[in-house]
């Protein structure tokens, strides 16, 4: 939804569209590990920018990722990771939706304007249905991307996926567990576990792809 709103806003201001498009796309071509480390610094308990802003408005500092003074909750860590993922994935989604918007025939909007249709109704009745191929594609690829997430955890939480104060990798993802088993799993069967997990992940992605094909035929409007 956020990427759609930004794409619509960019499409409505053609004068600065190229400049803004470049600015929004920069995070996508930046090294993900480097961005994650920047986020880890921003959400640092003692000297992070986010806690500094919270304290400026009279609030108490939050243990986002944990520190020597306290342990962060799972949901605080998850919030930081989600903010990073959204910020990092947003440029690609905006670019796809913006290209879709520019391919929509302007006659639809002209007819809606003559009929006195509101902007909200135009968005929900014209723009969204005609962008359904791009929207469905982004939804499915985002779902698949969630299974493959690895860089964000390593960059923000660390290679052990264990926040400060915890004894177990509560932030471990599917790919993280596969990688840990490849490095050396329990009982010397790490490579076997990783191979089985990779096969299972492949099957899940194939099922999602099949569902995508089914949904596209039923709900996508060209």
Locations of regions flagged by a protein language model:
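A structural signal for multi-pass alpha-helical bundles of membrane permease subunits
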Residues: 1-222
């Amino acid at each position: 939804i956020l990427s759609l709103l930004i794409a619509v806003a960019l499409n409505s201001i053609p004068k600065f569209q190229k400049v803004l498009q470049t600015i929004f796309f920069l995070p996508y071509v930046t090294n993900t590990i480097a961005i994650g480390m920047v986020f880890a610094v921003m959400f640092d308990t003692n000297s992070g920018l986010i806690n500094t802003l919270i304290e400026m408005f009279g609030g108490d500092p939050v243990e986002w990722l944990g520190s020597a003074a306290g342990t962060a909750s799972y949901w605080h860590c998850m919030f930081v990771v989600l903010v990073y993922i959204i910020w990092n994935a947003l440029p690609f989604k905006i670019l796809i939706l913006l290209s879709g918007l520019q391919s929509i025939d302007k006659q639809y909007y002209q007819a809606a304007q003559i009929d006195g249709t509101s902007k909200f109704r135009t968005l929900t009745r014209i723009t969204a249905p005609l962008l359904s191929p791009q929207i469905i594609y982004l939804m499915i690829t985002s779902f698949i991307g969630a299974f493959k997430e690895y860089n964000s955890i390593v960059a923000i939480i660390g290679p052990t996926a264990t926040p400060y104060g915890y004894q177990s990798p509560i932030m471990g993802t599917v790919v993280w567990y596969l990688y840990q088993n490849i490095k050396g799993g329990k009982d010397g069967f790490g490579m076997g576990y990783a191979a089985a997990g990779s096969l299972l992940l492949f099957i899940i992605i194939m099922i999602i792809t099949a569902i995508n094909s089914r949904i596209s035929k039923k709900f996508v409007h060209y």
